[in-house]
Design a protein with these regions (language model features):
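Active-site-adjacent loop/helix micro-motif of nuclease/hydrolase catalytic cores
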Residues: 125, 177-185, 207, 234-244, ...
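Switch I (effector-binding) loop of TRAFAC-class P-loop GTPase G-domains
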Residues: 133-183
Length: 321
């Protein structure tokens, strides 16, 4: 009966109840209860990052297959991962981080540059890039820089919060005509940015790619990466291939291993059935990336979630926003 009643309380209420006495401190840590909260709530979370990603495989296992030590991790797993709990526990920006950002602004006198790529740019009914370029009330266009990259261009500069300029270099897999044909037919367009390596004909081929020289030049000069993932649940996805391409773009021989990766888990519009961001991070094997990353839910039509993601990647790049 206690368990049934506690299941109607919020996790925050349970934590307060647990602070009243030793008895409730023990009772509210019931692993079955916190596993229930995890399975119930994580599909509704709008972002997850490299510091808060829960162990999806452990959560999905039957309780009978877990030992006692593992069982007691569920409460900590929830508090670490839940966006609401993390906002309450988030410390103030530490002094040295602010100083680092200030020094970064003195040394780097050009606007930060971000490379944006991924199937969500090409497969969705609503174009994220087109919406960004025509939504001055959300993210105004600030200009087109003169710095050119051969075969790529200069990208587009935007303004965040009316004070911080940043530049996005959008990398498409192929021509606009081929992308549109693939979108209508719900096929994957041939990706001309990547060259597959290894034995493709092997019985168990491993996905491995290298990127073409023009894109390599982009990867060497950018401060971070935005990967636009198709989060719509109604079609098949090639997540292993996507992860291999993310690895190729962020390879350590092309630049610093500290450059962050923002994954915009994107759908066309509100009401579209989406893959939860926690499952997106799990499917893309982001825990295997040796760099900061964030998965942020986003909508192309309204640009919901976009600014949150941009703020995160700029802060991770050393920009005080």
């Amino acid at each position: 009966m206690q368990f049934y009643i506690m299941s109607f309380l919020s996790p925050q209420d349970l934590c307060q109840l647990g602070s009243t006495c030793q008895y409730w401190h023990t009772v509210v840590r019931d692993p079955v209860l916190w596993r229930y909260f995890l399975l119930r709530d994580l599909p509704s979370w709008s972002f997850i990052d490299h510091n808060s990603m829960p162990d999806v495989e452990k959560i999905s296992k039957p309780l009978g297959g877990l030992d006692d030590d593992t069982m007691h991790d569920y409460m900590q797993e929830y508090l670490k991962s839940c966006p609401g709990c993390r906002r309450r526990l988030k410390p103030y920006r530490r002094g040295y981080a602010a100083v680092t950002s200030f020094l970064h602004s003195l040394v780097i006198n050009t606007e930060p540059r971000l490379a944006m790529f991924g199937p969500g740019l090409e497969q969705l009914e609503v174009s994220l890039v087109r919406k960004m370029m025509h939504s001055p009330d959300v993210i105004p266009v600030a200009g087109f820089p003169q710095r050119q990259i051969n075969g790529i261009g200069s990208g587009i500069s935007f303004m965040l919060n009316n004070k911080q300029r940043f530049n996005i270099l959008t990398l498409y897999s192929t021509t606009s005509k081929e992308r549109e044909r693939a979108r209508v037919e719900q096929n994957n367009a041939p990706n001309k940015m990547f060259l597959q390596e290894g034995d493709v004909a092997a019985e168990c081929p491993t996905m491995s790619y290298r990127i073409i020289p023009q894109v390599q030049e982009v990867c060497r000069v950018v401060d971070g990466f935005i990967y636009v993932a198709n989060a719509e649940a109604g079609r098949s996805h090639e997540r292993e291939e996507e992860f291999a391409q993310i690895q190729a773009m962020t390879a350590s021989d092309l630049g610093s291993s500290n450059r962050p990766v923002l994954v915009l888990s994107c759908v066309s519009r509100a009401g579209t059935r989406r893959i939860p961001c926690v499952y997106m991070a799990h499917e893309l094997h982001l825990n295997r990336l040796p760099r900061p990353w964030l998965v942020q839910d986003a909508e192309a039509e309204t640009l919901n979630g976009l600014l949150n993601g941009i703020e995160w990647i700029l802060e991770e790049s050393g920009i005080n926003v």
